[in-house]
Amino acid sequence: MKPTIALVGRPNVGKSTLFNRLTRTKDALVHDLPGLTRDRHYGHGKVGSKPYLVIDTGGFEPVVDSGILHEMAKQTLQAVDEADAVVFLVDGRTGLTPQDKIIADRLRQSPRPVYLAVNKGEGGNRAVLAAEFYELALGDPYVISGAHGDGVYYLIEDILEKFPEPEAEEADARHPVFAVIGRPNVGKSTLVNAILGEERVITFDMAGTTRDSIHIDFEREGKPFTIIDTAGVRRRGKVDEAVEKFSVIKAMQAVEAANVAVLVLDAQQDIADQDATIAGFALEAGRALVVAVNKWDGISEERREQVKRDINRKLYFLDFAKFHFISALKERGIDGLFDSIQAAYNAAMIKMPTPKITRVLQSAIERQQPPRAGLVRPKMRYAHQGGMNPPVIVVHGNSLHAISDSYTRYLTQTFRKAFNLQGTPLRIQYNVSENPYENAEDKPKKKPLRRVSLSNRIEKREGRKEEKNRFKKKTKVSVKKQFSK
């Protein structure tokens, strides 16, 4: 599992700026696709060979007892519980504040390692900036600049040093490894119990039970499977905003380790933004996806039609996924769900022959040429497979930068139908053939044309005539001498 790093601190100390630096992006983890909820609180990062997850917790005002700031403080404390390491960010320009001292007191009570980072330290004397923050008793401060990157690498390198090198991903297994993901209280734990055929206690409120996903190997109808149990993220009692928010972290970690994700929805509730966000993580990671709409037996026919319309409207970007309407409690629809898991796994791990890929590409071009972009028309020559889980098709040609998104969607649907890629995302990459003379400096220089005057041409012509006449005379003389002998 990737270690999770939580960014904690007062408002306006630069947590979002540091988050963007650590994730190397200014956008959300989820692509800006229609229907996907943008979420700037979670992101991926990597230093060397070590990947990590980072959480931007929002501003922490511990002295507020109610309102939105109080909720943000609750979410921050939840982040500390869920994280593997905590970066406590303070403002080097403002200096030490009473709120910083209160936050530090709470962080010292946590068993998680805490790293004190003095932000906005660009251009200043590091020793002077760090001096007053030793009062927080959180070890040596790291003086950094989230905006310019100063000192950030050393901070993250020290954090990750305590975590082992990542092992080979579980997604490389030769059988389906699937994760049950979704919001709290949608029936994930019930579905896990129905799948395994036994009651398992997975909702204990004990330290550790909500932190690590459990990998369980089992067989069903003679076929091996591995399930990643993330149901332990749910806590007893009321599921508040903080718990629901951090269920996303569990989904991210589980999706990374799986090759198939099973997204569980609650038919008794409307499709929430969080559902779309979690689905977006699976799509971003390129994992095969199966959707289980749970508690289907407990709603009326009218409600069923409403749920289907809601799904079509809010999750239409999952048109490649198979939807199953099940009852985990009564174990209805589980067999069909497993058939789709196996099919999605097979599609994600498919090996496509290059000749067939190219034939499908040429057939698609014959049916519909790519539209021109100004005076340029893209020319696609051949294609081959570039990867699995998800399948990647690499198209080679010229002027491929001019291919529109709509034509890419057309090609995606064509390849999906030709290879029966049900349940997995399909990615198309364009590889433009390079012109060796693209730069003017590299072009071979043509010889300049010589201008020859008319008089020079006449002189040359007369000279050739005289030469020819002299040759004829010599020939006649030599022939006469030969016969005279």
Swiss-Prot record:
Q: What is one GO biological process annotated to this record?
A: ribosome biogenesis
Its keywords, alphabetically, are:
GTP-binding, Nucleotide-binding, Repeat, Ribosome biogenesis
In this chain, GTP 2 is annotated as bound at: 182-189, 229-233, 294-297
Q: Name one Pfam family in it.
A: MMR_HSR1
Domain EngA-type G, first and last residues per copy: 3-167, 176-349
* Cited SMART domains: AAA
Matching SUPFAM superfamilies, A to Z? Answer: P-loop containing nucleoside triphosphate hydrolases
Query: Where is this chain compositionally biased, Basic and acidic residues type?
Result: 457-469
User: Which segments carry the region annotation Disordered?
Assistant: 435-485
Which residue windows does the record flag with biased composition (Basic residues)? 470-485
Classification via HAMAP family: GTPase_Der
Please state which protein family the record places this protein in: Belongs to the TRAFAC class TrmE-Era-EngA-EngB-Septin-like GTPase superfamily. EngA (Der) GTPase family.
What the entry lists under NCBIfam families is as follows:
GTPase_EngA, small_GTP
**Protein task:** GTPase that plays an essential role in the late steps of ribosome biogenesis.
Q: How does it assemble?
A: Associates with the 50S ribosomal subunit.
Q: What is this protein called?
A: GTPase Der
**Record lineage:** Bacteria, Pseudomonadati, Pseudomonadota, Betaproteobacteria, Neisseriales
